[in-house]
Amino acid sequence: MKFLLLPPAVILFFAAFVITGCSTANKTASKKDWVPLFNGKDINDWIVKIQQHDAGVNFGNTFRVANNTIQVRYDEYGPEFKEQFGHLYYKTPFSYYHLKLEYRFVGEWVKTAPTYTLRNSGVMFHSQSPYSMPKEQDWPISVEMQFLGGLSDGKPRPTGNMCSPGTEVMQKDSLVPSHCINSTSKTYDGEQWVSAELIVLGDSLITHIINGDTVLQYSKPQIGGAVVNRYDPAIKKDGQLLSSGFIALQSEGQPVDFRNIRIKDLSGQYKSKQAKL
């Protein structure tokens, strides 16, 4: 059998072609892995739950859509905020995933809201269902990736923190006693868009990422602790690990915009690895 010897230049050309083709295929597959949770047009795939109102009631048109963003506004609330804290839940729960979104604080804070809500919002995850919350319950039993905006006073105010309404988490093999853990992020003043990412591996490791930088990690999210009121006692089973739950965007007195909300399912990748351990 005779073999055809090709010039080195020709071999390099075909090798580059194959590598480029594989790279393009991988990038295409990677892009397809990301699923948008917000279509830029409406919130039909989302469920509103606002304190003092039943699930599904978008009181005061709190959550609305404009310019391909979910906008949180309070202009129809009247003179008093009355602690009508709200959350906008995606319709299905998740367990192992990588969530990406962008947010920005805009406009005037509602002065009748609690002072801690100034330039404050967040995304709740591993949350109880909105339909399991009594009308008067303030926060869902969940874990929060808290978003804070700088106050333009030169003082640090990190974002991408962790807060734990009705939950607890672990760091260095110990339960964290505080309600919130500050991240190592920079401070973001004004109305600039900030990119936030959340990597959730069931009831194992949780990672917070802000503008591409890993700013916080912890593990073993579980039900426990306080800072949640008027809940159904049957739901709050202290010590129960949280391996899945709903994702929700927060409204608590500060106008905020959300956009480019998308998710990548990691369950196939990580559950199979854990099963082999």
Language model features by range: what are they?
Residues 22-277:
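Carbohydrate-interacting regions of secretory-pathway proteins
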Residues 1-30:
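Bacterial Sec-dependent N-terminal signal peptides
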